């Protein structure tokens, strides 16, 4: 369900064959290096690397997101535009009638092969997105995990309770 909205509304989504052609020779080396890091320092070393990557993502995109202002939708779009510049083919789509949330969809992932072996990298990216957007985001799918796109759910508003409305529970 999470990626279906993105698939229907995305500008471009790379096919599996395209991902192979877009991949570079560094993926295998990076996976082996992270595997070796894990052998030497255990899971903590890989987690430390992922945390450093999260901080790097925050540093790279913080000025762009900050300059976008305070509107969460505009901030999410600024992040998507910056990610697209870096090869992630990112888009933002309203869900739920455009009132409560958007989805950040990434149609390509330059580190997909490495992240398939080390999902901590996807977790680090998700953490960075939440910090950048200053909301609790939720990753719904990843290319590395077999999804058609990476999809991140971003709440952008709170439900409005109409005056006089009652919260009634039925038993």
Predicted regions and their residues:
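Short, small-residue-biased leader/transition segments that mark boundaries at the very start
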Residues: 1-7
């Amino acid at each position: 369900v999470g990626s279906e909205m993105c698939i229907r509304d995305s500008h471009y989504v790379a096919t599996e064959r395209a991902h192979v052609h877009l991949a570079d020779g560094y993926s295998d080396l990076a996976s082996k290096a992270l595997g070796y890091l894990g052998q030497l320092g255990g899971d903590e070393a890989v987690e430390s690397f992922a945390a450093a990557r999260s901080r790097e993502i925050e540093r790279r995109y913080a000025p762009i997101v900050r300059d976008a202002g305070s509107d969460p939708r505009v901030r999410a779009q600024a992040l998507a535009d910056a990610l697209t510049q870096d090869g992630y083919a990112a888009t933002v789509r309203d869900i739920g009638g455009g009132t409560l949330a958007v989805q950040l969809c990434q149609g390509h992932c330059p580190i997909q092969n490495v992240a398939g072996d080390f999902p901590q990298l996807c977790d680090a990216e998700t953490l960075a997105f939440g910090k950048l957007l200053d909301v609790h985001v939720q990753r719904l799918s990843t290319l590395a995990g077999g999804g058609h796109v990476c999809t991140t759910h971003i709440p952008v508003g709170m439900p409005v309770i109409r005056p006089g409305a009652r919260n009634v529970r039925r038993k």
